[in-house]
UniProtKB/Swiss-Prot annotation:
Protein name: Large ribosomal subunit protein uL14
Cited SUPFAM superfamilies: Ribosomal protein L14
Keyword Nucleus annotated: no
Quaternary context: Part of the 50S ribosomal subunit. Forms a cluster with proteins L3 and L19. In the 70S ribosome, L14 and L19 interact and together make contacts with the 16S rRNA in bridges B5 and B8.
Protein species of origin: Enterobacter sp. (strain 638)
GO CC terms in record: cytosolic large ribosomal subunit
Entry's Gene Ontology BP terms: translation
Functional description taken from the UniProt entry: Binds to 23S rRNA. Forms part of two intersubunit bridges in the 70S ribosome.
């Protein structure tokens, strides 16, 4: 469960290390975002010579949460931290060319197939 002010790690090579959620997209009073939801983020920590810089405001898709994801069979997949993949503001395609760490099968929609194909492991 990601809400405003939540700090997340970045699971791609866009150049950002830590980001903060500033808005959960999809509804006027939507409070939480889970795996597969798009959020608005600001870059809090970035590496030198990256594709993004500190202070940039972009969109991101949540790929891992500590809260986890509940499957129809009743199982829950939880992770050690909250992570996201940074997206282009217009096309909503990933900025980075590599994804680090596992992602869940819930991302397997038309919009996020690129993330699934780049990920080293799909749970």
């Amino acid at each position: 469960m990601i809400q405003e002010q939540t700090m997340l790690t970045v699971a791609d090579n866009s150049g950002a290390r830590r980001v903060m959620c500033i808005k959960v997209l999809g509804g006027s009073h939507r409070r939480y975002a889970g795996v597969g939801d798009i959020i608005k983020i600001t870059i809090k920590e970035a590496i030198p010579r990256g594709k993004v810089k500190k202070g940039d405001v972009l969109k991101a898709v949540v790929v891992r949460t500590r809260k986890g994801v509940r499957r129809p069979d009743g199982s829950v997949i939880r992770f050690d931290g909250n992570a996201c993949v940074i997206l282009n503001n217009n096309s909503e395609q990933p900025i980075g060319t590599r994804i680090f760490g596992p992602v869940t099968r819930e991302l397997r929609t038309e919009k996020f197939m690129k993330i699934i194909s780049l990920a080293p492991e799909v749970l």
